[in-house]
Structures are given as structure tokens and as C-alpha cells.
Amino acid sequence: MTELLFNKRLQVLVKSKDTDERRSVIRVSIELQLPSSPVHRKDLVVRLTDDTDLYFLYNLIISEEDFQSLKVQQGLLIDFTSFPQKFIDLLEQCICEQDKESPRFLLQLSSSSSAFDHSPSNLNIVETNAFKHLTHLSLKLLPGSDTDIKKYLASCLSSVKEEKQQLQQKLRKTEEDLTRQLNYAQQTLSEKSRELDKLRSEWTSQTTSLSSRHMQDLTAEREKALETQSRLQQQNEQLRQELESSHHRSTQQLQTKVSELETANRELIDKKYKSDSTIRDLKAKLTSLEEECQRSKQQVLSLRRENSALDSECHEKERLLNQLQTRVAVLEQEIKDKDQLVLRTKEVLEATQQQKNSVEGNAESKQLQISKLESTVKSLSEELIKANGIIKKLQADLKALLGKIKVKNSVTVPQEKILQETSDKLQRQQRELQDTQQRLSLKEEEAAKLKEQLEATVQKLDESREVLKTNENVITWLNKQLNENQLSRKQETVAMFETPAAALRSAAVPHNMAFPITSTINSKYPLALSCVSSGSRSVLTSSNGPKVQFNPMSVKPSAAEVSPAAFSQPANKENSEPVGLDSKYFERRDDSIPLRGLLPSMHLNREVPKPLNTAAAKATPSAFFPG
């Protein structure tokens, strides 16, 4: 039995005797032959093949005895059991490094002959470092004989046949699956087509029934819309007047607030300018004081340096004076000694004079000694006089230095006082500057808050103006829709009921007829819809059709007139489109502005009809209620 451990393609550097080096891709396979009986041992088989050249075959069988000799020859440190895994690890490193320009691990196949015919070749695993090419392992492979090549080709052929059989079996299975799926899809398609035919027939029947039912519902809804139209108009007029008055009051209040805020802002700006000017003055004073302080500090430093130099000179003079005083003391001691010696010599002289008669021979020598001593005494007295003169000069210099030091101290003391006063003034100015800066920051915060309030009020005012503009646009659009609906209803009634009585009734349309206007506007500040009013803001004017004129307070006066000829469209009789307002304008929304008293009155009017409206409908003929 054999166990395949490694089978991969690697780039190999091929070397021969008389040819250049080249790189080729060679398949390296490592197999472990397991023994059939416990007596035999395991063998490791290394095989080199080329997928493009089927006759390229090199084999190497390594037994445990061969590995021991290989271990001794190449200095290996592993056993036979761990050798295959280490060999595979080296090959994996060669695979990782083979795509690089300068691979660290390289697989070499070298032959001693000029071509790879039937001579053995060496397979080397070489590591390239900065010092040398290090060969980790070198295996001597033998070329395969004819029988080996035939066995290898036979094994390749058998493996190819097995793969072919497996692929054929997979192909049969896939064909069977696809045919089964195709049959199932065809069956489902036929079933779905039958269901589709049934659904089409049902749909045609349902559409016919729904169209007839829809026509009946449309006629009923038209009648209800005409009833609610006249009822809602009066409520909308009242609501519009209330909303306009509230808008007028709110705009006046906002304008007064804006004027107050502007005056406060101007006062704050004036205060800010004044504080800025005071800050500039204080800063200028501060800079001047700082400059004076710097100058005084520099003067103090220079005076301190001069004082230190004078102190050092004074110390040197005192040291010299002490040295001279010690020398004078020594000389005085010597003079005293000499005086004592002179006294002694006088005594000796007296004794000698007394002994003159007895010692005449030694008189000359004694006189010589006396003359010598007198000369030494004279020299000592002269030196003493010179030392006294030097001491007097040093004392005079010391007095002059002490006077200079006193003058310097008298100059530096007032300068230090001035410096202390300037530093105190500077500290006071800094404290005042900090206080003014704090007051300025408070004023700036107050100004920022007032600016924010002003911006908020201006923003609210702009938004209210935008809402008023949108309300105006909605009113104009609704009036256009109502005009178009009325014209289409007129055309339908004229086409369906064209009789003399109907003509008389269509001629007697009231001119002061009003139209319902409802709207829900989603905005950040919900404001009521400004609808059409009577008087200067009347909804309806002369006979050509309903016209709307809306003049809010915050917008420039503009008249939005809508003529029925410009926006009239022919009624779609085939589809029977509903005429009047869309149902979305009658729906209740959570974010809408509630119309005061509208919904309860609508509910009551649905339950109990008003006698005034019915009487008016019966008394006055109208184009909306023919016949």
C-alpha cells in the first residue's frame, strides 16, 4: 500500500553541463510505501514528472538504511519518521518563494551530462542568504527505465479513465435531473395557463359588475358632494375671517417685538463699542507701563551689575589692606625687636665704654658692628615710612569707594521704589483690565442671547410668511379645481338634460355662490388656512365665473384671478371621472389644523338635513341641481 504525502507543481532551476540554466515547472510527488508484513520496513518514494513531457520521469526510493547513510553524509539532525514532513516543509517554502524576483529558497535539478537522457541527476534545496548558497538537502534521482515509464503511463491512463467514468456518470445524472425538471415545468405551465384563462373570464365579469356599481356610487357621491359644498362654504368663510384677524394680531405683536429687540441690539452695540474703546485705551496704557517697567528693570539690572563689580573691587581692596596691615604689624614687631636690640647694644656700649680701658683691642670690631646695625636701622625706618604711605593711599581709596557705593545705593533705592510703584500700578491696571474683560464677556453673552432671540423671531416671522404664501397658493389651486369641476358639471348637465327648463335654470345661476376650501398643511408652526373673505377679499365677483382675490398683511397685494375658459377641460364621459374635490381633502389628519365647529356640524348635517338649504334648493333653480 502507498500513501500519497505530497503532489504539487513547482518551479525548478534546471542545470546541465553544456546548456544554460532554465526554469521549468515539474511535478514533485512524495509517497510512503507501507509494508504489507511487519518484517518489511517503510520506504519513501520521491518522483519527478513533467505534465507536458510524459517521458520525463525520475525516481528515488529511500529506505531507512539509505536514510542513515544520507544522514551521515549530509549531517541531518532528524529521524526517518520526521524526514518526509521536513522535506515537504522545505518544498512548501520553495512554493512560497518561487514568485519573487530573488527567492530565498530554490529548488535545483542538476545533471552532469549535457542533456537529461539516462544519467542520474541531483535535486537540491538551496537557501540563499547574504553570505552563501546553503544547500539544505541534496537527493540523487535516477531516471526511469522503460518499464518504469510504462508503469507510470499506465497509472496515468487508468486515473484518466476513472475521471472520465466519473464525469460520464455526473453527466447522466444532470441530464436526468434536467429532463425531470423540464417535464415538471411544462406541467406547471399548462396548469398555470388554464388558471390564467379562468381568472381572465372572472376578471371580465367582475369588471362589468364593478363598472355598473361604480357608476351608481358616483352619482350618489356627486349628490352628497353638492350638499356638503353649500354647507361647508359658510363655515369656511367664518373660519377664514377668524384666522385672518388672529394672523393680523400675531404679525403686529411680532413686529413690535422685532422693533424692541432692534433697539436693544443697538444699545448693546453702542455699549460694546464703548467698552472696546476703553479696552483699547487700557491696552495702550498697559503697553506703555510695561515698557517703562522693562526699562526700569534693565536699569536696576545694570545698577546691580555695577554694584556687584564695586563690591568685588571693595573686597579686593579690603583684602589688600588686610595684607598690608599684617605686613605693617610684622614690620612694627621687627622695629620693636630692633629697638630692644638697640637698647641692648647701648647697654653693651656703655658696658664696653666702661670696659674701654680693659677692652681696647675689641673696640674697632664693636664699632663696625654698630655701624652695620645703624645702617640696618635706617633701612628699616625707610621701609616703614614707605609702608605708612601705602597704607594711607589704600585708606583714601577705600573711603572713595565707600562714597561711590553710598551714591549708588542712594540712586538705586528710589529707582527700586519707582519700580515697586510701577509694578503695583501695573497689577492694578491688570485687575481693572480683567474686570473690564469679564464685563465685556458678559455683555457679549447678553448680545449673543439677544441675537439668537432676534434670529429666532425673524425665523418664525419668515416661516409664518412662507406658510401664508403656501396657504395662498393652496387657495388659488382649490379655486381652480372648483372652477374646473363646476364647468365640467355644467357641460355634463347641459349635454344630458338639454331642455328649455334646464336652459332657464342654467341661466339663473346665483352669482354670489361660495366654494368650500379645506387644506391640511404640515409645517413646523401650524397656522390656519387663510381662505377667501367677503368685502375687499371676496371670493366671487362678476358673472364669468368664480374669482379669488387674497391680500394677506405680510405679502404684497396680488390678485389671483382664475377664469373658467383657461382651465376648463372636457368631461370624460366614458370613464365617468368624479367631479368635485378629491376625497383626500375630506379626510381627517392628525397633523392638520382643526376647523372650528366643522366636523360636528358635518356629522349633524348628515343625520338631520337643514330645512333652509332644502327650501333654497327648491326655490332657486341652479345648474348644480338640474330638474
Curated annotation (Swiss-Prot):
The keyword Coiled coil applies. GO terms for cellular component: centriole; centrosome; cytoplasm; deuterosome; procentriole replication complex. Residues 39-91 form the PISA domain. It holds the Pfam family Sas6_CC. Keywords: Cell cycle, Coiled coil, Cytoplasm, Cytoskeleton. Residues 202-213 have a biased composition (Polar residues). GO terms for biological process: centriole replication; centrosome duplication; embryonic cleavage; mitotic spindle organization; nuclear division; positive regulation of centriole replication; positive regulation of G1/S transition of mitotic cell cycle; positive regulation of mitotic spindle organization. Residues 153-473 form a coiled coil. Residues 229-238 have a biased composition (Low complexity). Central scaffolding component of the centrioles ensuring their 9-fold symmetry. Required for centrosome biogenesis and duplication: required both for mother-centriole-dependent centriole duplication and deuterosome-dependent centriole amplification in multiciliated cells. The 35 nM long coiled-coil domain mediates homodimerization while the globular N-terminus links the dimers at an angle of 40 degrees to form the inner ring. This is Spindle assembly abnormal protein 6 homolog. The gene is sass6.
